[in-house]
Amino acid sequence: MEKIQMTTPLVEMDGDEMTRILWKMIKDELLLPFIDLKTEYYDLGLEHRNETNDQVTVDSANATKKYGVAVKCATITPNATRMTEYNLKEMWKSPNGTIRAMLDGTVFRTPIVVKGIEPCVRNWKKPITIARHAYGDVYKNAEIRIPGPGKAELVYTAEDGTETRELIHNFTGAGVIQGMHNLDHSIESFARSCFEYALSTKQDLWFASKDTISKKYDHRFKDIFQEIFDAEYKEKFAEAGITYFYTLIDDAVARIMKAEGGFIWACKNYDGDVMSDMVSSAFGSLAMMTSVLVSPHGYYEYEAAHGTVQRHYYRHLKGEETSTNSVATIFAWTGALRKRGEMDGNAELSAFADRLEKATIATIESGKMTKDLALITTMENPTVLNSRDFILAIREELEK
């Protein structure tokens, strides 16, 4: 069989633990037999990040700027336990955080819907995509533990020395304070990424915050979204037959529970972090959730929405069999290959990505699945496969 050719490489970011094992299986069984795969490879495994003082993460992000499309394996974000386990020089930052900041991107997470894995919310029929702003808020905050009575203020000092002060609280005892920030240009990039993604997928866009309480911080998000929509996207949305809709975050949650899905829900950083896990769990499994980082500059980075599956990896190291769900990692590859095909005018490559996704879904819908799905499926007597056999079953379906 003649392999599908590629003209431009993908940026390939390898990762850690069980997902790294699955990564190689997916390439060996589902990609390399069918595609003359061209990638520029970066090893983002924690050991190599430590060896390079995390320079490899920066290099991979710069390569994504050069080539436009990347695919990333799940990676470890180290904590104190990992510092000891891997004998790290320092507690390296989250690779995802570094890449997001360098690409100025927005993360879109979408559940993979299959028959037999029913959402907890009965009326959800179509995927709900969460768009998470990837800068600032609590993730770039400053915090002070207040030891006792005193006055806490927000102070802004302009370049000319002028000060603006706002009282936070007069403390009569111990407490805690937190300062957060965001940037207009980052919010603008977030808004444009959301509007562009809505147009490309032809889905309605919702944005929600709490501007009634946060009259300056959250209201700034609301205003920027509305200004950009009115100036740049109102006519395009009307032509595409889609809508932009703003509401309060609590109202959005109530509406989500009654909706049937099929839209994009844009959230601030923390809201998106929480709500994407809620939506993925309610649709069935975090292992059935795709994630794509979209930059307003035209860069795309695809990955699974879940972590490195640490417990399965430790069992794998002991020689024990695992039944690890590889679907989201497969869909990271298909998303990247499809986008590469679109950007290069390579219809054959994009068509292969579609075929592989259909083969993956068909395998599950035929009753062959990993243990996590077997525990939640409505099918009777599903066949539980181990990690490798599940991938081999997909290959068998792909070759039909």
Where are each of the predicted segments found?
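Flexible, glycine/charged-enriched surface loops at secondary-structure junctions
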Residues: 35-41, 201-209, 233-246, 341-353, ...
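Glycine-rich phosphate/pyrophosphate-binding loop and the adjoining helix
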Residues: 134-135, 140-191, 198, 343-346, ...
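N-terminal alpha-helical transmembrane segments of multi-pass membrane transport
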Residues: 2-8, 18, 22-23, 28-53, ...
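Glycine-rich phosphate/diphosphate-binding loop of Rossmann-like nucleotide-binding domains
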Residues: 6-25, 29, 154-247
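N-terminal glycine-rich phosphate/adenylate-binding segment common to multiple enzyme folds
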Residues: 47-159, 163, 270-274
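N-terminal small/polar loop signature for handling phosphorylated ligands or for N-terminal nucleophile
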Residues: 46-60, 222-263, 267
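Glycine-rich phosphate/nucleotide-binding loop
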Residues: 256-355, 359-366
